[in-house]
């Protein structure tokens, strides 16, 4: 890494794909971060070192479908805490609770097993990217409905111009992100 900060180091491994999935969209592809084991270790360590702090340490890590599973499961393993997936509707086999949220065009629903967390659990909610904040907000509502406290939201990438990080912070959710990108 030489003289680069962790954030600058990770930024150089995030690929920007123009006009995908639609014209005018700059897709931020995190898969290069996962392909090199040294880079992946730096990424995971950036989260793990933060959440080893006693004041921030969660009881459970919850990951949002689908790239939040990759990060969340490894971070939970490293912290020696449980991991729970928050899935798109219809993907979990047991009794679930669900939350519907609005998208730019339409809506989406996420769900969580009803026994995934216990009342009082301190939960870190993690995803790869924060755009509008809708998915993270829905995940938070699910966890809180089950009695857990979401202590912080975390993501690799923040797209602040889309307003999600501002909305989440205004709702009272602290956020930790590693790399900001301008634009959509």
From Swiss-Prot:
Location(s) in or outside the cell: Cytoplasm
InterPro entries on file: Ade_phspho_trans, PRibTrfase_dom, PRTase-like, UPRTase/APRTase
Catalytic reaction(s) noted: AMP + diphosphate = 5-phospho-alpha-D-ribose 1-diphosphate + adenine
Enzyme Commission number(s): 2.4.2.7
CDD domains in UniProt: PRTases_typeI (cd06223)
Annotated transmembrane regions: none
Listed Gene3D superfamilies: 3.40.50.2020
SUPFAM superfamilies recorded: PRTase-like
Function comment: Catalyzes a salvage reaction resulting in the formation of AMP, that is energically less costly than de novo synthesis.
Name this polypeptide is given: Adenine phosphoribosyltransferase
């Amino acid at each position: 890494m030489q003289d680069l900060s962790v954030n600058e180091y990770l930024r150089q491994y995030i690929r920007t794909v123009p006009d995908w999935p639609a014209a005018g969209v700059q897709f931020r592809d995190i898969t290069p971060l996962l392909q090199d084991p040294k880079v992946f270790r730096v990424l995971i360590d950036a989260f793990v070192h933060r959440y080893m702090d006693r004041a921030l340490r969660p009881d459970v890590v919850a990951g949002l479908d689908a790239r939040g599973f990759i990060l969340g499961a490894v971070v939970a393993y490293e912290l020696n805490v449980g991991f729970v997936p928050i899935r798109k509707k219809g993907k979990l086999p047991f009794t679930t609770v669900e939350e519907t949220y609005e998208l730019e065009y339409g809506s989406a629903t996420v769900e969580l097993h009803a026994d995934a967390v216990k009342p009082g659990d301190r939960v870190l909610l993690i995803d790869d990217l924060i755009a509008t904040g809708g998915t993270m907000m829905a995940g938070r509502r699910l966890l809180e409905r089950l009695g857990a406290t979401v202590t912080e939201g975390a993501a690799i990438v923040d797209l602040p111009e889309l307003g999600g990080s501002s909305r989440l912070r205004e709702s009272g959710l602290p956020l930790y992100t590693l790399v900001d990108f301008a634009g959509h």
